[in-house]
Amino acid sequence: MATVHILTQYVWPDAAPTGLYAEQLAARLEQDGRDVRLVGGRGGYRELQRKRPVARITHLNHYRGSRGNLRQSFTEYASVTRAFCDYIGRFVRHDDVVVVTSAPPNTVTLAQAIRRRGARSIYWLQDYYPELVRGLYEYPVPLRAVFRRFWDHHLGRWDRIVKIGSNLGGPTRNAVVIRNWPTMSFDRPTAPEPRTALYSGNLGYGHDIELLVHACGKLRTAGYRVTMRSDGRGAWQLPAWLQPMPLENDPAKLRDDLLRHEVHLVAANPKITQAIFPSKIWNTFAARRKLVCTGFAGPMIEELEISKLAPFDRHLEQWTDLIATAQNSGQPNRVERIEPALA
């Protein structure tokens, strides 16, 4: 039986968002009877208590930097990518399927290593880095164009790119849109506490902190009690009245937190519209809570409106169908492109 290898920087017991999605895809594939390996590094991003998702999890050795230290982070990115390349050379066989997430970003260069093994390659584009780095440094437009050409050249080498939203940059020729989904279930309807608002998650390079603080201020003026649970560099920039609490690391408490609040805040950056689409939105949709989105503009607003109608309970099935097609074809994956409005 051919193996599906899913490679991402952080895996269980860590709880980075990309890792959570990777493990839930792996668990579904294992449930369907497929041979699957979840492969990641040994670094730490975020804690969340949960049981082991699949039987076969491989943790690779690599340099581990300090989160928040850019030099160390980039060194870790390169080290993880080298470890992935070594893993591909040693363990990937002809006709296997290799799914690689955009964490770390350097993994965009791994398509040729997978092709040399005679396997099919799928790149899971959670973040489009030529645009995302603008949150760190607003580099000149000509340089941006050069970086995009370089990145898109490497993206074009993959048999298939899976974008999590129609707003993400990158080539379209080999791309399909399969959106993310709620990472937890909300089976029992629960009424929220009135006039409560919650931000829960990362505040990083793709977020306009000033716009988020302004929205929180308007809610506070309207009588809402605003709870801020966040990590990342943006958390350091919050005013004293919005000082963040730690993120919940117990899934039951996190679920209760999401259900208890009437309004969920989601942040973006209006200058950076092709880099990300916030995955936390899907838990809000599933919990049936009100959304207050800050920094959404252009393509992100369009993607938000599409996502409100998207059948998120089918998104994992779209993934398994795509992988089944890749495994059953003797050639690179040729499934029909899923149009953004229909994904």
Model-identified regions with their sequence ranges:
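Acidic anion/phosphate-binding donor-loop and adjacent secondary structure
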Residues: 176-195, 208, 330
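Membrane-proximal helix-turn-helix segments that form the acceptor-binding/catalytic region
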Residues: 106-109, 113-116, 129, 141-161
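Nucleotide-activated donor-binding/catalytic signature segment of Leloir-type glycosyltransferases, i.e.
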Residues: 230-258
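N-terminal subdomain of nucleotide-sugar transferases
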Residues: 1-51, 160, 214-223
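Nucleotide-sugar-dependent
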Residues: 207, 250-256, 264-285, 292-303
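An aromatic- and histidine-rich active-site surface loop
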Residues: 79-84, 89, 97-117, 123-126, ...
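Carbohydrate-associated surface elements
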Residues: 42, 164-167, 178-181
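Conserved donor-binding/catalytic core segment of Leloir-type glycosyltransferases
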Residues: 189-207, 213-216, 227
